Design a protein with these regions (language model features):
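Short beta->alpha junction loops
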Residues: 2, 176-182
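Conserved thiamine diphosphate
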Residues: 3-8, 12-150, 155-158, 173
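Residues at the C-terminal ends
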Residues: 16, 107, 168, 194-195
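Short, glycine/polar-rich helix-capping loops at beta-to-alpha or helix-loop-helix junctions
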Residues: 73-78, 163, 184-188
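A glycine- and small/hydrophobic-rich beta-loop-beta segment
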Residues: 140, 167, 191-192
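Hydrophobic, well-ordered secondary-structure elements that form the walls
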Residues: 149, 166, 177, 200
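Short helix-loop-beta junction
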Residues: 158-176
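Glycine-rich, anion-gripping cofactor-binding loops and their flanking helix/strand elements
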Residues: 182-205
Length: 205
């Protein structure tokens, strides 16, 4: 049966039993049906047990609009999950990050949510490395001195396109791909803002 509450519950049980399951709930909208399992069990159990138990489950969910997927398949709820203690929230924008982040997530002792924008699903690319990706830092995708554009996931290509158009007008921008929504890499953002003194945030959520 289609039961996101059940899928995530089974994943949590498997994680507690020593496995490292990957649960796919198709779209972020339907993850709301599993919110109790995610918030009250997966995210909280390590802290409730003083570290005696961990829940190394990875939950993948598609997010984002613009693909004619109807109202129940196109929400962007990653900002909700980014406010839940005990969860790491990842948002890959490239094929390499989508692969590498999943590899790294499978080594985490805590639950990881990967919000995957639907726009890049049809992208293909050669991977330079099959190694896990560092999920503790944002990535500077373009260098500039006049403004900082901060984006993540499916908004990163749009931010890069905008930066290219601005460059033609003589405005050079840093483009930061957050990559990790929780915990945020404040240091990378602040370093850029201290240089440019101007910030534009591109965000569907």
């Amino acid at each position: 049966p289609i039961s996101e509450l059940g899928f995530v519950g089974i994943g949590i049980g498997a994680a507690l039993g020593g496995l490292r399951p990957i649960v796919e709930v198709m779209t972020v909208n339907f993850s709301l049906l599993a919110l109790d399992q995610i918030v009250n069990t997966a995210a909280a159990l390590r802290h409730m047990s003083s570290g005696q138990f961990s829940v190394p489950v990875v939950v993948r969910m598609a997010t984002g609009a613009g693909r004619q997927l109807a109202a129940q398949h196109s929400h962007s709820l990653e900002n909700w999950y980014a406010h839940i203690p005990g969860i790491t929230v990842l948002a890959p924008a490239t094929v390499a990050d989508a692969y590498g982040m999943l590899r790294t997530a499978l080594t985490s002792p805590d639950p990881v949510i990967i919000v995957e924008h639907v726009a890049p699903y049809n992208l293909a690319a050669e991977l330079d490395s099959l190694a896990p990706t560092d999920i503790s830092r944002a990535a500077l995708r373009r260098n500039g001195t006049d403004a900082t554009i901060i984006a993540y996931g499916g908004c990163v290509p749009k931010a890069l396109d905008a930066a290219e158009q601005l460059a033609q007008a003589g405005i050079e921008c840093d483009v930061i791909d957050l990559r990790v929504l929780r915990p945020l890499d404040d240091a990378t953002m602040m370093e850029s803002v201290r240089k440019t003194h101007r910030v534009v945030v591109v965000d569907e959520a």
